Every structure is written in structure tokens, then in C-alpha cells.
Amino acid sequence: MDLWQLLLTLALAGSSDAFSGSEATAAILSRAPWSLQSVNPGLKTNSSKEPKFTKCRSPERETFSCHWTDEVHHGTKNLGPIQLFYTRRNTQEWTQEWKECPDYVSAGENSCYFNSSFTSIWIPYCIKLTSNGGTVDEKCFSVDEIVQPDPPIALNWTLLNVSLTGIHADIQVRWEAPRNADIQKGWMVLEYELQYKEVNETKWKMMDPILTTSVPVYSLKVDKEYEVRVRSKQRNSGNYGEFSEVLYVTLPQMSQFTCEEDFYFPWLLIIIFGIFGLTVMLFVFLFSKQQRIKMLILPPVPVPKIKGIDPDLLKEGKLEEVNTILAIHDSYKPEFHSDDSWVEFIELDIDEPDEKTEESDTDRLLSSDHEKSHSNLGVKDGDSGRTSCCEPDILETDFNANDIHEGTSEVAQPQRLKGEADLLCLDQKNQNNSPYHDACPATQQPSVIQAEKNKPQPLPTEGAESTHQAAHIQLSNPSSLSNIDFYAQVSDITPAGSVVLSPGQKNKAGMSQCDMHPEMVSLCQENFLMDNAYFCEADAKKCIPVAPHIKVESHIQPSLNQEDIYITTESLTTAAGRPGTGEHVPGSEMPVPDYTSIHIVQSPQGLILNATALPLPDKEFLSSCGYVSTDQLNKIMP
């Protein structure tokens, strides 16, 4: 089979000169199998030394032309004239025959020109080069793909502006579209690309493609010469066409100074120093206005302010000074309620000044009229009555406070102890003349206070009325004035309303009378245990020693069961050891002191009086009272 094909090919090659046209030769060559071409290298359609297509272009999408080389003519072997054949494919297969180039002259040497009659834009074309009946090059394309417009024409430039430094300038470059391109009707839409460079440079600077025929060029150096060129292409298809002619741009010198290098403004340094300066200014402002800014951000807390008080005292915490200032101002003093259960002081009725000048204090004390108008030595009982007699601790506390308040002096303490014992005897004497002789004087005078350890101790105030009655009977009897002990000094006033007196003169007759009636002293034991909760030493000495002469056990026993009674342990032991203590050595008479001065004014009606200093009598001080229970008292007493 291969042999017959080889023979047929040789026959055709030998008879190629007999064919009338080159088209048949080309057709035969194209139909020749590849195997024959490999056997005969001269039949190859594309050789390194054979003609080739260089380009095919359509400047306006209406006509096109193709160009090729003729290198084969310069070779050792001459293949004959070069011919171009073309065909148009209407379908998938090439059904039409090849046709030769219609014009070899219009487009120039080694070219083929297709006018508008042979041009179809949307129909593909295939072209080939043949020499001596053989195909040397072949190519297929469409007219729209080979569009390359002609270069723009009429390039020029104008100066836009020059920089302030005179170093740079801006220009505007203008041109016109190719004359054969139908731009007005929109048959072609062209894109333009501008390139420029200095004359001595080799690399062109390209600008972005534009659709207009003018573009500004910025920052061109003065005293430099530039080259500018422009080219165009079909938008969205095709390739750029040829560049236009080069436009030379020379900018004149605008200033006397020439600058060979660019002057770059130090924007970075300016920004850095600007930020640093603003930061410094901000810190200075904050430092100078820090107090005001602090008040705006953190408002101050209002300080405590009280009218008349320095706020610094409140800040420093000096509460004592604040309390002192508050105590001075009347508006800040606390209000005492009228229903207070505690009595703060005892109100006294103060006589008029003219009344004091009429008679002495001694006469007023001895006057019965004065007793009627001013019972209990002018003391007005302001006790509310709510203080219980069973609260010795509270009364003792108030008594101690009065002693500390300079109520009595150390000189008056022995006189007070002696006077209290004498007062007991005085009451016993008065009891003989009273219809109530079976009651003990000690139970009728609870307002007279026995001093213990240089401190007055309060007694229950239930028998205050009987005490006042006894005192009134004694003072109203003129015959008994020579036998009484005169109490001239009010040493203290207890919160419960009792008055503590100091003796001025001891009467011998009174003391002897007290000793001459031991049976009356023994009778006081019964009422003492029933009415009083406390026994002091002076009472125990007078009542307990005479207990064996009178039988009062039946009277004492019921009262012991009713309540707890406490008496002084030392007084019991002393009285038991000395049964004959009822006989006392009478002392010398002492002058009667008058009210000499007012010691303290506690209120408009409360007074503490001082007496003249008197010589101290020779007597034994009563020892401090201890307390024993009722059972111990029953065991000790005979």
C-alpha cells in the first residue's frame, strides 16, 4: 500500500508543470499525507528558510492586509514566486476552494491587501503562502482580532502651572485620533496610552489608559527635555498599534536658581515634631489647670459645716472642742423633757434681800412661823417620786458626785458625824413628849444621813413627814430650846430631797438625857427593823446594848421574816464588847455658827452654804459600815 502511494506521489510531482493553475498544486499538496512529507522534506509547508507571515492588521475594521518575509529568495535554493491563497469558512468545514490574493501592490512589497469588498468582520479567514506549488506558511484569524489602529496624529502640549519653588511644572498633552478610524459614528472605540521620559533616559514612564485625546502630565522638572509618544488600540480587543511621532517638551527656566536634584519637603520630621509639641502643650495645660480639671472630673464632697464652728475642727476630729462650742451656744443645748424620772437638783426658796436683813439666820431657823411657811428648812421637794427607795446604788452615785463637787470640806466631816449621833438622841427626847412614843426616832428621820467613809449615804425617804413633825414639835416648845443641838450648816442636798446638816453645838443636857433613857433606845429596835433597810453604826450603838433589859424578841422576829435587813458588822461587835457605852463623857460647849457664805448656786432655787471653821471636837470617828445578813444579826443580838 505504501509503495503505491509513493509511486503516485512521484508521478504527480513529475507532471506538476502540466497543471494550468497553482491552486490545483496547492490542493494536491495539502492532500498529501504526512508520511510523504516526511519522506520528501521538500514538501514541508513550514521551513526555517521559507517565507513566513509577519503580521495581519486592520486599521479601521473595514479593510486588512497581511505581510510576510522572503528569506527563501536569499537562500541557495529558489523555490519560485511566493503566492498567497485565502479562504473563508462559513461552516465548520472548509467547503470552498482557495483563492489567490486580490492585491499584491496596495499594501506594499511582500503583502496582500484586502479591500472592503473582500473583508467580512465576523467571518473567519484562513491564509497560506505557497512557492512552487508547495505551502510554506498558513494562518487563520478573524478581522476583529487583527485590528491595530493607526498612530494618533497632531500631538502638542501646553503649560498648566509651575510650582512655587519654580522647580516643577505641569503640562497638558493633546492629540487627534487616526483619520481612517470612524470615531464619530462609534464604529471604533479607541483607548490611548501615553508614555514619556527624559531625553537621556532609556526607560519610558507609562500612564494609565484613557479614552480621551488629552491628558495632564505632572511634576516635570524645569530645564529638562522630555519625549512624549502615544499609541491606541481597539477597546476590549486587539493590540496596540504603532506609536505616534515623538513629541519633545522643553520647559523654560522660571527662577534664577537651578536645582539638579529634587527638593523633598521634610513632612515626616514636621509631623514628628508637631506631635511632640502638642503633647508637651497638653501636659503643661493639664499641670496648670489640674485643680479645675479635677473639680470637673471629680466634684468635691461637701465638707460638714456648722454655723459658728471652724470646719478644720471637724476635719481633724477634735470632738471635745466641738462639744464645748456646742455647749456654749443656747441653740445647740439639748432640751430636757419635763417627764424625766431623775431629779437633777433640789429647788430652794430664797428669801428676799430685805427679809434677810431683818433677822438673822438663827432666828429664822428657831421661829415657828418660819417653819409653817417654810417646812423642812425651806427646802422644796422637787422629787418626782419615781426614784425608788430600794435603789441605794443610784443614790450613792449621786451622793458621791455631790461630795466631789466641793459640797463639804474635810474640817466639817467630824462635826457631821458627831451631829448625826446627837440628832438621833434629840429625836429620842422629843419622842417622850409626843403621843407616838412607841416609835423610834431613827425611823422618823430618814432624811438625816449618816456619813460613811467621809461620804454621805442616803436613807429611804418614806419617813420624811414624821421627821418634819418631830422637828416642828421640838422647835415649837420654848422650854426645849436650851437642850437641843443647833444645826447651822446645810452641808449637802441629796438628789432624793434629803438635807445633810452639820452640828454647831452639842448640849450636855441632851446627851445626858439620851443616856438616861435606855429603855427608849431598846424600843427603837423593833421599828428600825421593820421600816429601814440599813443600820448604821450610830444607831446600833444606841439600840443594841440595852436589848437585854427589855424583851423585844417577839417584836423583832416577825419583821425579820418580811424583808432582808443589813446592819453594820463592826457596830454590832463594838456594841457587844462595850455594854456600857450608853454613858458618854459630855463635851465642852461650842459656839453656834451662823450661815456665813453661799458656796455654790446650783440653780435659781438651789444653794450650798458654807459655815465658819470651828475647832474640831475630840471624838472617835465612826468606822466604815460593813453589812451582815438578818440571820447573822439574830445570832449576835441577845
Swiss-Prot record:
A Pfam family: GHBP
Chief location: membrane
Disulphide bridges: 56-66, 101-112, 126-140
Region (Required for JAK2 binding): 294-379
Modified-residue entries (Phosphotyrosine), positions: 487, 595
Post-translational modification comment from the UniProt entry: The soluble form (GHBP) is produced by phorbol ester-promoted proteolytic cleavage at the cell surface (shedding) by ADAM17/TACE. Shedding is inhibited by growth hormone (GH) binding to the receptor probably due to a conformational change in GHR rendering the receptor inaccessible to ADAM17.
GO biological process: cartilage development involved in endochondral bone morphogenesis; cell surface receptor signaling pathway via JAK-STAT; cellular response to hormone stimulus; cellular response to insulin stimulus; cytokine-mediated signaling pathway; endocytosis; growth hormone receptor signaling pathway; hormone metabolic process
GO MF annotation terms: cytokine binding; growth factor binding; growth hormone receptor activity; identical protein binding; lipid binding; peptide hormone binding; proline-rich region binding; protein homodimerization activity
SUPFAM superfamilies assigned: Fibronectin type III
UniProt xrefs under InterPro entries: FN3_dom, FN3_sf, GHBP, Growth/epo_recpt_lig-bind, Ig-like_fold, Long_hematopoietin_rcpt_CS
Segments in the Cytoplasmic topological domain: 289-638
Localization, UniProt: Cell membrane
Keywords: Cell membrane, Disease variant, Disulfide bond, Dwarfism, Endocytosis, Glycoprotein, Membrane, Phosphoprotein, Receptor, Secreted, Signal, Transmembrane, Transmembrane helix, Ubl conjugation
Organs and tissues of expression: Expressed in various tissues with high expression in liver and skeletal muscle.
Recorded consequence of changing residue 242 to D: Found in a patient with idiopathic short stature; uncertain significance
Motif, Box 1 motif: chain positions: 297-305
Chain's role: Receptor for pituitary gland growth hormone (GH1) involved in regulating postnatal body growth. On ligand binding, couples to the JAK2/STAT5 pathway.
Disease: Laron syndrome: A severe form of growth hormone insensitivity characterized by growth impairment, short stature, dysfunctional growth hormone receptor, and failure to generate insulin-like growth factor I in response to growth hormone.
Protein name (database record): Growth hormone receptor
The organism of origin for this protein: Homo sapiens
